[in-house]
Amino acid sequence: MEKIRLKLKAYDHRVLDRSVASIVEAVKRTGADLRGPIPLPTKIRRYTVIKGPHVNKDSREQFEIRVHSRIIDIIVATPETVDSLMKLDLAPEVDVEVRSMGQE
């Protein structure tokens, strides 16, 4: 029995929440114990760009990218749980990072 931590990131929170819901459903179907989804603070990266190619520094445009994150901890992961997670078809926009947290 092993602890697994899933960290999911996406630019669109709706796509992220759908992926989290499908992961939680798959884990609960196998009977594993889980904690989460835990929402992490949204990271906002802002960029300021001068509009014109030459002078006129007063004319600027601002852009931002928001990265939404969630953590799911699977406390008691069985081989069946890992197999069901591998078979899941998640959205391509969602970045999934899997870490093994050790043995119990």
Swiss-Prot record:
Keywords: Ribonucleoprotein, Ribosomal protein. Signal peptide: none annotated. One of its GO terms (molecular function) is tRNA binding. GO terms for cellular component: ribonucleoprotein complex; ribosome. Transmembrane segments: none annotated. It holds the Pfam family Ribosomal_S10. InterPro entries: Ribosomal_uS10, Ribosomal_uS10_CS, Ribosomal_uS10_dom, Ribosomal_uS10_dom_sf. Gene3D superfamilies: Ribosomal protein S10 domain. The keyword Repressor does not apply. GO terms for biological process: translation. The keyword Chloroplast does not apply. It comes from the Bacteria. PANTHER family: 30S RIBOSOMAL PROTEIN S10 FAMILY MEMBER. Involved in the binding of tRNA to the ribosomes. Belongs to the universal ribosomal protein uS10 family. Part of the 30S ribosomal subunit. This is Small ribosomal subunit protein uS10.
